[in-house]
Design a protein with these regions (language model features):
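A glycine/proline-hinged amphipathic helix-loop "lid/cap" segment
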Residues: 1-92, 331
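Alpha/beta-hydrolase superfamily serine-hydrolase fold, recognizing
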Residues: 4-7, 77-82, 86-91, 95-331
Length: 331
């Protein structure tokens, strides 16, 4: 059986894996400009892996850095929820008549970030997709290493599944996140599967995630490189070693979800740029998802670095539109 994959987007967002996605000539002007902007900001700054996590967090809170705090939404509220004795704080971007719930898990290497730091982005998702957004305030490493973060996110997911109709008048849920948030989303899907609780999870929006704690070639090959990346190899190692402390088996699916049994998973959309050191994580996980008979799509953005969609551009808008189309298709 010969399957011919055709390109499905005129703006160089490849929705199948093609050599053209990795050809430098297909990097758009706005991505070149974005990369130059990132390099100019980072070239004279101290390496991020040399800055303590609490300092990085405060810099972002004060509006500094490349991924700065966003103004609060008037529609946002914090609520403590729980299953049994396990309590978790969630941040809700309310919607009067949502079609579904978007369970969002923020990025930050499991060590920085917060549920209330991207209100404007989450409000836009709520408006564009007609949904209520629930973002999880999970505990951060190194103070709270693995498995604190997935335990908190699992509690939030189970609570949503059990209370979605009563609280939000809809039982449909799409889960998703960026970077560490995509990792946690995949881990939570595996945990929910083990509980037989995947029925109301309609899809997964997995944006430049990390799925193998042993690290994939695209990350490892940059060891010792002096090239400037938004997410460097040294920072990936620092995040990983701060999150997985002690004798943690990095081949476990709960640690590296790429090792999990992905049979029966909901449809997933993977998004990644070819300049991202986590590129192979998305390429490999996309293939694994399909190999287990689960539906998956992928957006590959030529030349884009980690967190590229945090910067306004024509390409970012095109990616957002593709994600919206995917989410609407799975409901």
């Amino acid at each position: 059986l010969l399957i011919i994959l055709k390109l499905a987007h005129k703006k160089m967002l490849f929705t199948s894996i093609s050599p053209e996605a990795f050809d430098h000539k297909n990097i758009s002007k706005d991505i070149h400009e974005m990369n130059d902007h990132i390099k100019n900001l980072l070239v004279n700054a101290p390496p991020s892996h040399e800055i303590p996590f609490d300092v990085l967090q405060e810099i972002r809170r004060q509006g500094g850095g490349l991924l700065a705090f966003q103004p609060y939404s008037d529609r946002a509220e914090n609520r403590q929820i729980g299953i049994g004795d396990h309590k978790v704080m969630i941040r809700i971007i309310n919607h009067d008549s949502p079609d579904f719930i978007y369970m969002h898990i923020h990025g930050g290497g499991h060590c920085i970030g917060a549920a209330d730091m991207q209100d404007q982005s989450l409000e836009k998702i709520s408006n564009d997709l007609n949904c209520v957004v629930v973002s999880v305030e999970y505990r951060l490493a190194p103070t709270n290493p693995y498995p604190a973060a997935p335990d908190d996110c699992e509690t939030a997911a189970v609570w949503l599944i059990e209370n979605s109709k009563k609280e939000f008048n809809t039982e449909k849920i799409v889960i998703g996140g960026e970077s560490a948030g995509a990792n946690l989303s995949a881990v939570i899907l595996l945990r929910l599967k083990s509980k037989g609780m995947l029925d109301t999870i309609k899809g997964a929006n997995l944006i430049y995630g990390s799925y193998d704690a042993r690290l994939t070639p695209s990350a490892i090959r940059q060891e010792g490189s002096e090239e400037i990346f938004l997410l460097s190899y040294a920072m990936i190692r620092k995040f990983r070693d701060s999150y997985f402390q002690g004798d943690v088996d990095k081949s476990l699916p709960d640690v590296s979800p790429i090792q999990g049994d992905l049979t029966g998973m909901p449809p997933a959309l993977f998004t990644v740029g070819t300049r991202d050191l986590l590129l192979d994580d998305s390429l490999f996980m996309y293939g694994r998802w399909l190999s287990y008979g689960s539906n998956a799509e992928i957006i590959i953005v030529p030349g884009a670095d980690h967190a590229f969609n945090a910067f306004p551009s024509e390409t970012t808008t095109s990616v957002e539109n593709k994600i919206s189309k995917f989410v609407k298709s799975v409901l």
